[in-house]
Curated annotation (Swiss-Prot):
Example GO molecular function: thermospermine synthase activity
Keyword Transport: no
Binding sites annotated in the UniProt record for S-methyl-5'-thioadenosine: Q33, D109, D141, G142
EC number annotated for this UniProt entry: 2.5.1.16
Protein name, entry field: Polyamine aminopropyltransferase
Originating organism: Saccharolobus islandicus (strain L.S.2.15 / Lassen #1)
Key words, A-Z: Cytoplasm, Polyamine biosynthesis, Spermidine biosynthesis, Transferase
Pfam families the UniProt entry points to: Spermine_synt_N (PF17284), Spermine_synth (PF01564)
Task of the protein: Catalyzes the irreversible transfer of a propylamine group from the amino donor S-adenosylmethioninamine (decarboxy-AdoMet) to putrescine (1,4-diaminobutane) to yield spermidine.
Domain of life: Archaea
Keyword Membrane found: no
Subcellular location: Cytoplasm
Annotated catalytic residues: D159
Gene name for this UniProt entry: speE
Length: 301
């Protein structure tokens, strides 16, 4: 943060995106991270964690719909039990609860203060999802929860902060962690994770794909443009192949499974999001790294 007026968000060690800030609603250094709620001049209300924009009112729906719906629509059966790790704004939870079949949505976040801020300032994100009777909110470390849970899930959604070295999410992008997730999935289940930016950290994006494919065998990658992130943003899915869904299948499953409106995701945006451009696809052939606990991948910024 540069004073109270500008956020200088470092995308790489040698470039940043400057955001003009109109107002600061709340700011606190929690035991886990530095959390700030602001009003951006261009993007409206927004959440910043450790100097990185997490989401803004302008385009959060694009991120959250592409994170959730390709996974849940590609499951062979409509999901009943869904686990969310992270996603403190409540918007991922909001999208999961649009599924008529969902009986229980467990959301695990390490930082109670983020949830508190979201409930107070980010209604446009959660839209009451925290109070839904199907919601189970757990405040704990994600890895601790995974190690201790006795339940199994139809889908696991990882809406985590970037794998910045020594951050709270640093080790939640490794082969060993994904193996733990595989162990608590029901048969036919799948996972998705936000996978950083093909624009600024292409090697990380591809390595996350490689790591998930190593564990789940079936994997696919999507991307979209996020104006508030100043570039492309990526997602990786494991255990299922949403990229193989036809446009007709996407449309029919939206009608069958979802109650409520979608603002971004439809058959056409699905097709475009999984149509990786040639220059990005070529990197999947060149980069072979798999992220492990001994040699984890991380965003350099």
């Amino acid at each position: 943060m540069f004073g109270w007026h500008w956020l200088l968000e470092w995308q790489t060690p040698y470039e940043f995106h400057g955001h003009l800030i109109e107002k600061v609603f709340a700011e606190e250094k929690t035991p886990y991270q530095h959390v700030t709620l602001v009003e951006f001049t261009r993007f409206g209300k927004g959440l910043i964690i450790d100097g990185k924009v997490q989401s803004t009112l302008y385009d959060e729906h694009i991120y959250h719909e592409l994170l959730v719906h390709p996974l849940l629509l590609s499951l062979p059966k409509p999901p009943k039990n869904v686990l969310i790790l992270g996603g403190g704004e409540g918007a991922t939870l909001r999208e999961v609860l649009k599924y008529k079949s969902v009986e229980k949505a467990v959301m695990v976040d390490i930082d109670e203060k983020v949830i508190e801020f979201a409930k107070k300032y980010l209604y446009e994100w959660h839209q009451g999802a925290f109070e839904d009777k199907r919601t189970s909110l757990v405040i704990t470390d994600g890895l601790k929860f995974i190690n201790e849970t006795k339940d199994k899930y139809d889908a696991i959604i990882l809406d985590l902060t970037d794998p910045i070295k020594d951050s709270t999410s640093y080790m939640l992008y490794t082969k060993e962690f994904y193996e733990k997730l595989r162990g608590i999935l029901n048969q036919g289940g799948g996972i998705v994770t936000q996978a950083t930016s093909p624009s600024f950290s292409l090697e990380v994006y591809v390595t996350i794909y490689n790591t998930i494919k190593e564990v789940f065998k079936e994997a696919s990658a999507s991307y979209t443009y996020m104006a508030s992130f100043d570039g492309l943003w990526g997602f990786v899915y494991g255990g299922v192949r949403p990229d193989l869904l036809s446009e007709d299948e996407v449309n029919s499953r939206i009608r069958e499974r979802i109650s409520g409106q979608l603002r971004f995701y439809d058959d056409y945006s699905h097709k475009i999001s999984f149509s990786l451009p040639k220059n990005i696809k070529s990197e999947f052939k060149k980069i072979t790294k798999v992220s492990t606990e001994k040699d984890p991948i991380y965003v350099p910024a």
